[in-house]
Amino acid sequence: MKKVITASNYEVIPLDLRTNVRFYTSVDFGSYVPPHWHDAIEILYLQEGELKVNTESTSRNLHSGQCTLIQPNKVHSTLCTRPNKAIVFQIPLLFLEKFVPDASRLTFQLEGTPRQASQPEWDRQKTQINQFKEKLTQMQFIMDTKPDEAPLMFNTLLFDVLYQLYHNFSFGFTADSTSRQNQNLEKLKPVLDYINCNYNRAISLTEISRIAMFDPKYFCRFFKKCMGTTFLEYQNDIRISHIYQDLVSTNDKISVILERHGFTNYKLFRKVFYEHFGATPTEVRKNNSVYQKTTL
């Protein structure tokens, strides 16, 4: 697997050189992934547990057996407060465009399409999604068992899945506004990289505006429009993500963890943390300890 750095905002996906995609089984006992995006279709097939997926202005709670697709360059975040197991499948847009020339202009959707369907049409859609999930499960089995013929077997299924995506789950061309949004996200890359490297200290609006080369007032509007959250909220999201991981993976005191990650306002921290996880830090740590003693 090609080793690359994955930022917490713009995600650079590590690809398997034999397949040109990323496919793996995720077992998560609890996590928060702040808003980010990538130049790839992302498919999440939840096999056990629950997962909350926020995509720009929408929010969806996935349950066992459900599948969702995230469009390329769409800002999204995920929240896991209970153990889950899922297939994660990421298809780079550049790879897909080799076989589907208009892929960057297509809208892909799996479950929950907005179309009004008759009963026969609805039955057909359910059959298609079940067939799609079955292919993902077969790909997972190959990745887990790794037979000698694994690359050939996996790639055979991969192209079958790509065909299904194009033939059964693409719904027309995206608007021109999508292209403008992608350009705006490109402008934010250095800003988000800077926040990611310096999140554990105070970053002033003047300082971050200079990185963006924007007037501070314009920067605030621009950031909120692109990311769906304010600059300060985003910085706190990054902190919360790191704090959560330390809570469930270390025995460090909460005060030490907060200091490590730059959250100096404890009252605000408690408020933001509870809004994300519906529990106090102590409760999260206790519950996670119980979860990890059981199997999914």
Feature roles, as predicted:
Residues 2-24, 75-144, 163, 167-173:
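A hydrophobic/aromatic-rich effector-binding and dimerization subdomain
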Residues 49, 131-145, 187-198, 242, ...:
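Solvent-exposed, amphipathic alpha-helical segments
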Residues 291-296:
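Intrinsically disordered, low-complexity acidic/proline-/asparagine-rich linker or regulatory tail/stalk regions
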Residues 166-169, 196-198, 202-240, 252, ...:
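Basic/polar phosphate-binding segments, predominantly the helix-turn-helix DNA-binding elements
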Residues 22-38:
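Conserved short histidine dyad/triad with adjacent acidic residue
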Residues 57-71:
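Short acidic-glycine-tyrosine-enriched beta hairpin
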Residues 36-53:
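Short, conserved beta-strand element in jelly-roll/cupin
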Residues 117-128, 143-197, 201, 206-212, ...:
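Short, Lys/Arg-enriched, Trp-marked, Pro/Gly-tolerant hinge/linker segments that flank
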